[in-house]
Amino acid sequence: MKTVILSVNAGSSSVKLSAYTAEQGQSPIQIAEVQVSGLTAPPASLKYERGGKTIVKSREVDDQVSDQRDAFSLILKTLIEDDDLHDIQTKDDIGIICHRIVHGGDYTKPQLITNGTYHHLENLNDLAPLHNANSLPIVRLCVQDFPSARNVACFDSQFHSTIPEHIRTYPINQDIARRGRLRKYGFHGISYSFITRATAEFLGKDPSDVNIIALHLGSGASACAIKGGKSWDTSMGLTPLAGLPGATRSGSVDPSLVFHYASDVGKLSPASTKDLHISRAEEILNKQAGWKALTGTTDFRVIAAAATTTSSPTPSPNPNPNPNPDPNPDPNPDPQNQNHRLAFALLVDRISAFVGAYYVSLHGRVDALVFAGGIGERSAALRAAVVEQVGCLGFAADGDEDFDGDGGEGAVVVDVGREAAGGSDLGGRPRPRVLVCRTDEQFEMARMCAEDAEFWGSG
């Protein structure tokens, strides 16, 4: 029996919803997508697509739409009031609502949301105060207003439940660690689940036979070593702050840095509420760092353009420096361009370090290096710089400057490497591929729900 599945992805400044029809055990078919963005910088705007066709390109919405609950209510109203969207005419047409939850603690698979599940997610706010709080108000609204629908929590952390103990453990007192649930969890797991399946299909392999190094690069960025189709290691840790820098996140830094950065880091941030406790340290490293702190912008396109039109940010090591340097260097280089080059080079360095570490951790048995996420898909300059930096491991790009995420004729996975040129890696194995994957977290959540009999009332 066919039902409607809604996939809800609530961020700090936007709510995105994809609607699908599906039968149990079958692949979902997308019928609509709605996004409300700009919640933190009014006026917010709405974008609506139905059946792959743009219905509303961008429309400013009422000033009263100021938070995630308001945005979700507007999205639902948009769907129900569209007479041409025949599959959704009332709330009762919706069978399953799946919610992206960043931190799922020890959950290893999607969970049907009950009172017990919901209270457990509330308790996890202590571990992820800046992340889970965006999703829970919509979860609560859906549980109250959709009595005939099944609400399902899909966790960004669940994919990483396979990380071995020696990798996920922090070297601290283990009694305290167990009580406080202090260990590496990892995130972007819904995306990595999609990437693993899509890459395996592209390579003509079973997911259990695939070893890849995957990079989810967006305003939040992470890396993941995937061994036999399962997470082996990932750059994010207890929270999404660890690992790679992002638009406003520092990524991994010396843990004592923040205490030297400001004197009040242990105090609560003004952004805290009665139910949401955020320290100044968390606010500084999550909201006031990253490449925006270096350049003044969160737009990586601006950074990449400025960095790559001046000089290479990651020159290859040269044991014989140029004996004839420019006798007339620019005495007044543009400091803004210097900052952009610094941010670009810093990100390339951090990404390359994880690629190298994961290549070793996987014993050199790597089928592909996979770029995904908004920046991973669209920044040919970043891909080229990273691949050049890790070229000693056998990776090679094929000049994909024209691929900006919109090429590939709609393909989910595109080969941008030089596999066809032959060659081998350090171990004499065929050269690993360099791929771009258009990850789709909303689809992956809907697929998980469609395949699990429990969410259809038959498990």
From Swiss-Prot:
Q: Which domain of life is it from?
A: Eukaryota
User: So where does this one cross the membrane?
Assistant: none
Q: Residue spans with biased composition (Pro residues)?
A: 314-334
Q: What is its EC number?
A: 2.7.2.1
Provide the residue positions that the database annotates as binding Mg(2+).
N9, E441
Identify the residues that bind ATP: K16, H216, L217, G218, S219, G220, D299, F300, R301
Under the heading Pfam families, the entry gives: Acetate_kinase (PF00871)
Class of enzymatic activity (EC top level):
transferase
Entry's SUPFAM superfamilies?
Actin-like ATPase domain (SSF53067)
Keyword Magnesium on entry:
yes
Q: Where is this region: Disordered?
A: 308-338
Catalyzed reaction equations: acetate + ATP = acetyl phosphate + ADP
A GO MF term: magnesium ion binding
Q: In which pathway does it act?
A: Metabolic intermediate biosynthesis; acetyl-CoA biosynthesis; acetyl-CoA from acetate: step 1/2
Binding positions for substrate? Answer: R100
Query: What are the site positions for Transition state stabilizer?
Result: H188, R249
Record key words, sorted: ATP-binding, Kinase, Magnesium, Metal-binding, Nucleotide-binding, Transferase
A biological process from GO:
acetate metabolic process
What does this protein need as cofactor?
Answer: Mg(2+)
Q: Which protein family is named in the record?
A: Belongs to the acetokinase family.
Name by which UniProt lists this protein: Probable acetate kinase
